[in-house]
A protein has these predicted regions:
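N-terminal secretory signal peptides that target proteins for export/translocation
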Residues: 1-5
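N-terminal leader/targeting segments
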Residues: 7-8, 78
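Bacterial N-terminal signal peptides
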Residues: 8-20
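Scaffold/interface architecture of coatomer-like assemblies
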Residues: 23-342
Length: 342
């Protein structure tokens, strides 16, 4: 069964009391931080005064502004079989929004800086697999480029922010190796928090588009989140964040049927956001998977356009990207929610 859905405002207030912050905020590529003291869990946010009943407004889509024009930004991966296609030009792409062709106003095939949230499942069932998962995540962090930034979050019965966004390799490695396995699985809470954290990361300049991605490792169904699947999926679709999900299937045959719900959730999150999903059965496959994700992130195109749709009704808009090169298959997020007048 799905975890019960919680209204967005209530979820935000509740999660403020269940997320443990064990690192200090750092700007990307800053000098190595001093070792911070271990912070106590944050107290719950105060209860807001009652308001008249009203339908909550959805959060706006995360769009990019250039010269006062609102742009829809896409991270596009193009493959031909098992190979990444990295030599396409702007004229090789066509973008359609709700069936109408759009005009590309920004195109870049050079690797843009990226903000990464790495989520590690540290529930009790990960006990024997955790050392290998740690080493794979450390190897992934070592592939960061100087302008990139990574945050480390682990989750069991609740998510814990072990290291806020930084390019400091030593701090990232320390955070990853500090994880231990115990408790249940608050998967939805962890994804919800990481999406909120990524919204805080700003581009270095007005001309830069900082890509965003979540790399999520979990070995089972959500069992203890306060936020429901539908709300997490909705928030993901309102972001410009690609989700790369690694679902570590149970090795025992009987456990694979129990994994079906987690498999569905991870597949949906990755598909809707233009990411990718992996389902290994052996933890020793993780280093190769992290390597594949790193290679994909380094092979993406950054493309943006100003929508020709003048309506500001907050409706869902479907995006289709095509290429003119035979055999080249593009992949990106499936759409976004249009702007509103509020």
């Amino acid at each position: 069964m799905w975890a019960p859905r919680v209204p967005a405002l209530f979820a935000s207030l509740v999660l403020a009391g269940v997320v443990t912050l064990t690192g200090q905020q750092q700007p990307p590529a800053s000098a190595p931080p001093q070792t911070p003291p271990v912070a106590a869990p944050q107290p719950p946010a105060p209860t807001p005064p009652p308001t008249p009943p009203a339908q909550p407004q959805p959060p706006p889509s995360s769009q990019v502004f250039r010269g006062g024009v609102e742009l829809v930004s896409l991270n596009v991966t193009v493959t031909d079989g098992t190979k990444y296609v990295t030599d396409l030009n702007q004229e090789d792409f066509e973008i359609y929004e709700d069936g109408a062709m759009q005009t590309i106003t920004l195109f870049n095939r050079e690797t843009q800086p990226i903000a990464l949230a790495v989520l590690l499942d540290t529930s009790a069932s990960m006990d024997e697999r955790l050392p290998t998962a740690q080493e794979a995540a450390v190897g992934f962090s070592r592939r960061l480029k100087p302008k990139d930034a990574m945050e480390v979050i682990d989750f069991n019965s609740q998510p814990h922010i072990l290291q806020t966004f930084t390019a400091d390799q030593a701090a990232l490695e320390k955070a990853i190796r500090s994880t231990t396995a115990n408790g249940s699985t608050a998967l939805y809470n962890a994804v919800y928090i990481s999406l909120k954290e990524l919204k805080k990361v700003k581009a270095a300049s007005a001309d830069e588009i900082r890509r965003q991605a979540i790399v999520l490792l979990s070995d089972g169904d959500d069992t203890s989140s306060l936020v429901g699947y539908e709300e997490v999926l909705d928030l993901a679709k309102r972001s410009e964040t690609s989700i790369y999900a690694i679902g570590l299937r149970p090795e025992r045959i009987g456990g694979r049927q129990e994994f079906k719900e987690a498999e569905f959730v991870l597949r949906q999150l990755s598909t809707e956001t233009g990411g990718r999903v992996f389902f290994p059965t052996n933890v020793n496959e993780l280093p190769k998977i992290y390597e594949q994700i790193s290679e994909e992130l380094a092979s993406q195109y950054t493309i943006a356009y100003a929508s020709k749709n003048p309506l500001r009704n907050g409706a869902w808009r479907r995006i289709i990207v095509r290429t003119k090169r035979p055999g080249a298959v593009p992949r990106t997020r499936q759409g976004y929610y249009g702007p509103t007048n509020r």
